[in-house]
């Protein structure tokens, strides 16, 4: 049953224009039902965002795939994720690169995600409980940064933790949000609007 739902999701993502076979394989391999509350497991393979507690959500599979594709990852990419959340996006990334650095401001989510990722034998991930607005300076510069919550404005710290040619994929806005890909060229940053999106807000500070 799970296998067929995974195949249906794969077919849907292809219809939506996701064509990167490595990303599609990563999504097929991961049991999305493990990343959502048990009561919502029957909805895990639908293209919906689902609540995971603490006012946070797991993004819809299309958005996970699209944002991952926009990062243009190589296996050796130095990668930062802001907002570990359920750990699902983190797990997809971990299937594609040698190592993922992920920051989460809500301690309980960070702990649960860390435990689940290890249960799934994904050991190439470093998680940190901290304010995502600050990035992870000691691990920078990054080839790619992905932000899984919407910021009102682009966090400067994240821009300047990008390598030359590095890419930041981030939703921006409050009520109306746009998904942006920002590429660094020296001290200039080229911004592309990808599409309209809906994310929970990126909040500053960290929570125990």
UniProtKB/Swiss-Prot annotation:
UniProt xrefs under Gene3D superfamilies: Vaccinia Virus protein VP39
Pfam families noted in UniProt: PCMT
Biological process terms in GO annotation: methylation; protein modification process; protein repair
UniProt keyword list: Cytoplasm, Methyltransferase, S-adenosyl-L-methionine, Transferase
A GO molecular function held by the record: protein-L-isoaspartate (D-aspartate) O-methyltransferase activity
Catalytic activity as recorded in UniProt: [protein]-L-isoaspartate + S-adenosyl-L-methionine = [protein]-L-isoaspartate alpha-methyl ester + S-adenosyl-L-homocysteine
Record's function text: Catalyzes the methyl esterification of L-isoaspartyl residues in peptides and proteins that result from spontaneous decomposition of normal L-aspartyl and L-asparaginyl residues. It plays a role in the repair and/or degradation of damaged proteins.
PANTHER family, alphabetized: PROTEIN-L-ISOASPARTATE O-METHYLTRANSFERASE, PROTEIN-L-ISOASPARTATE(D-ASPARTATE) O-METHYLTRANSFERASE
Protein name: Protein-L-isoaspartate O-methyltransferase
Source lineage: Bacteria, Pseudomonadati, Pseudomonadota, Gammaproteobacteria, Vibrionales
